[in-house]
């Protein structure tokens, strides 16, 4: 029996070796497919839903980045502090990712951080990592080993980019620094498809307050308009800062489609002037409402805070006229559209939900007028407009104490506003 087994192994051995692909051929084929996807991405737009959680230590303590990154170090000290959700559209232009709120069709040159304005974010999931690793930063690649994932045989490669070649920046909106980075990826040796990419920053000490940022990206092939494209399915970002706070960001991509009409896709800056200079805005020739006119709105649809996200559109009905002493500009019953720009659950200290709403347009008999307004409150007959740092004040903020994560803001919820000049006209 032992001799028979030995003969069988000797017979199968050459067959197994001959079936294996040369790792360098796999790497070359994968690179070609990845760059082909990058070159064709400007024609496509996807929606990404981003779920974020932040966990922070229950008390202050001192630890080095090396200690904080040890397996399970300090995990018992971390408590869930907050969570929120974003929904955006993402496209690629001039080898850069461009973003807009979902369905807005106006992509911002300033990028994801300027559009959202707060919290942990990463803008590499859709295409930037592709461009950096396989083209711009000229990463160094080495074959690691063959692995089996879900019954599927894959090749694992390692890669690295030193600081002097890196375009990877970490930090906050006010301070960002370049960092070395590296990681690994899994490739299908038969189809040359990229299956999973893992990217980690490499630094022995904190960079712009960040000890480590690690991202895992899962990819799949999508058939669109008689072509196959390698697109992200999901990304998972973990950030550990030097205070011990841990942020986790999960991004899921969906609804990928091609823009057949460039007239519907506007690439430009995020200023209100540029938005109004679009073809649609010029065709409608919108007027501008005078500032300092109070009005009241009610929601026409409920908001389920368990599923809603910043970026989602909302609809309201005007219940009071927008007028001054001599003229009525908009009558009650008009439809007002806007957008959630922040929806956050806070769990520690005083648990609450806070939602930020920005108004966009009012429909007056089929004519849409841009609506610039902010939350309006009155005390003792005197108007009070709270000063806030987020979003330039062109929004309303509403706080609900002690509510559950699936709290519903009911249809008919009343809000009070006052018109203002657009930010670009201040």
Question: Where in this protein do the model-derived segments appear?
Answer:
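Contiguous beta-sheet cores, especially beta-hairpins with glycine/small-residue-rich turns
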Residues: 195-197, 201, 220, 284-426
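Sec/Tat signal peptide C-region and signal peptidase I cleavage site
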Residues: 15-19
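Glycine-rich, flexible loop segments associated with nucleotide phosphate handling
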Residues: 175-184, 354-357, 404
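Hydrophobic beta-strand positions
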Residues: 146, 186-187, 361-362
